[in-house]
Amino acid sequence: MSSLRQSEIKRKTNETDISVFINLDGSGISEIDTGIPFLDHMLHQISSHGLFDLQIKAIGDTHIDDHHTNEDVGIALGKAFSKALGERKGISRFGHFFAPLDEALVQVTLDCSGRPHLSYDLQLKAPRIGNYDTELVREFFIAFVNNSGITLHINQIRGSNSHHIVEACFKAFSRAMRMATEIDPRRSDSIPSSKGMLEKQ
């Protein structure tokens, strides 16, 4: 694969102003500032454990709440992943990982199929982690899936601490994405589909 697998997305609305840069073949370097500290912490997990170089800057109406910024970061990051993958030639396509964090264990399975779908099964008992509304975890992944064109299954195997569960989820997600987006040298420039194409629906 000769071309660089990286992309930049800028997205501005009346509610948020977001820029995202990603290098899929990076080393886990990140500069992230969304104005939402817990989301920043989770995005650093994606970069660190996925070995993606990631730069995210977001300015949003967090004086109202975090919903718009959280969702729009998911949108922009999903678009950045999709753009960096291009035609998805040579990728492994499928990824899965179990990540533990103390008592929590979360499984993530995904397919860079071009077919957006989310199955989400986290039981988060705490309404907030710090100041972060735990309902926003699902909203982030919905936004990401719809704009990256992946099929994503998130399953909580066990766990009681909401912070541990969410962090295990993001770590498993990052490793599964790393697995799915890595180049399979046996595929060369071929698209990993019997249809001969993978496109976001």
Swiss-Prot record:
Matching InterPro entries: IGPD_sf, ImidazoleglycerolP_deHydtase, ImidazoleglycerP_deHydtase_CS, Ribosomal_Su5_D2-typ_SF
Enzyme Commission designation: 4.2.1.19
Any one of the GO BP annotations: L-histidine biosynthetic process
Gene Ontology MF terms: imidazoleglycerol-phosphate dehydratase activity
UniProt xrefs under Gene3D superfamilies: Imidazole glycerol phosphate dehydratase, domain 1
Pathway(s) it belongs to: Amino-acid biosynthesis; L-histidine biosynthesis; L-histidine from 5-phospho-alpha-D-ribose 1-diphosphate: step 6/9
Subcellular location: Cytoplasm
GO cellular component: cytoplasm
UniProt entry keywords in alphabetical sequence: Amino-acid biosynthesis, Cytoplasm, Histidine biosynthesis, Lyase
Chief place of localization: cytoplasm
Catalysed reaction, written as an equation: D-erythro-1-(imidazol-4-yl)glycerol 3-phosphate = 3-(imidazol-4-yl)-2-oxopropyl phosphate + H2O
Family that this chain belongs to: Belongs to the imidazoleglycerol-phosphate dehydratase family.
Protein name: Imidazoleglycerol-phosphate dehydratase
Organism: Prochlorococcus marinus (strain AS9601)
